[in-house]
């Protein structure tokens, strides 16, 4: 699954279309990557609905009804708002600092991190702008398959 902010959709509309054409989930990460608990309720709704509306306008595709709050910051109020407007909020169970394109951890770090922290039911947070992730992904997936892991979409998990 990919969780996108508006700027990514603006910068990469063809790539977003490709994500959808290939069957990937494209979820909501707000228009402007705001801190949800510090944002008033009206603006929380706008950040989510405006981002979804923009994706539809820019790509012709609907955004999937999954939401990942920026930085994982939430409150009971913001969780309720996202639920009320029809989104399933998704968090992660393992992550590392991969979002700074000028300070990448390296592919060996990524591979070792997965070996150390992977667990059944894991939802890794992997930023798609990371060169280290791109370089390590094939090895990580191959290693996990050898260990008996299988991969499922968020839609599969939601079905239970």
Where are these regions (language model features)?
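Soluble non-cytosolic domains of exported or imported proteins
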Residues: 3, 10, 38-45, 72-73, ...
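Structural recognition of the beta-strand scaffold that forms the well-ordered cores
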Residues: 1-4, 25-28, 65-69, 88-92, ...
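Terminal accessory/targeting
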Residues: 1, 120-160
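Proline-centered helix-kink/hinge sites
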Residues: 30, 69-70, 138, 142
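His/Asp/Glu-enriched short active-site or ligand-binding loop at hydrolase and phosphoryl-transfer sites
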Residues: 73, 78-117, 149-160
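Active-site beta->alpha N-cap acidic-glycine motif
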Residues: 1-39, 43-64, 143, 156-160
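Active-site beta-loop-alpha junctions enriched in small/polar residues
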Residues: 5-7, 31, 70-72, 94-97, ...
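Solvent-exposed, polar/charged alpha-helical surfaces in well-ordered, non-transmembrane soluble domains
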Residues: 14-17, 21, 42-49, 53, ...
């Amino acid at each position: 699954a990919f969780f996108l902010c508006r700027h990514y959709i603006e910068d990469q509309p063809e790539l977003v279309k490709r994500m959808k054409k290939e069957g990937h989930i494209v979820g909501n990460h707000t228009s402007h990557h705001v801190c949800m608990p510090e944002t008033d309720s009206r603006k929380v709704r706008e950040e989510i609905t405006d981002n979804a509306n923009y994706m539809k306008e820019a790509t012709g595709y609907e955004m999937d009804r999954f939401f990942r709050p920026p930085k994982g910051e939430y409150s009971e109020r913001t969780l309720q708002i996202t639920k009320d407007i029809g989104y399933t909020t998704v968090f992660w169970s393992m992550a590392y600092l991969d979002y700074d394109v000028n300070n990448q951890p390296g592919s060996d770090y990524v591979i070792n991190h997965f070996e150390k922290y992977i667990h059944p039911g894991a939802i890794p947070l992997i930023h798609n702008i990371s060169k280290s992730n791109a370089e390590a992904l094939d090895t990580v997936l191959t290693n996990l398959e050898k260990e008996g892991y299988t991969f499922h979409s968020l839609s599969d998990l939601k079905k239970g």
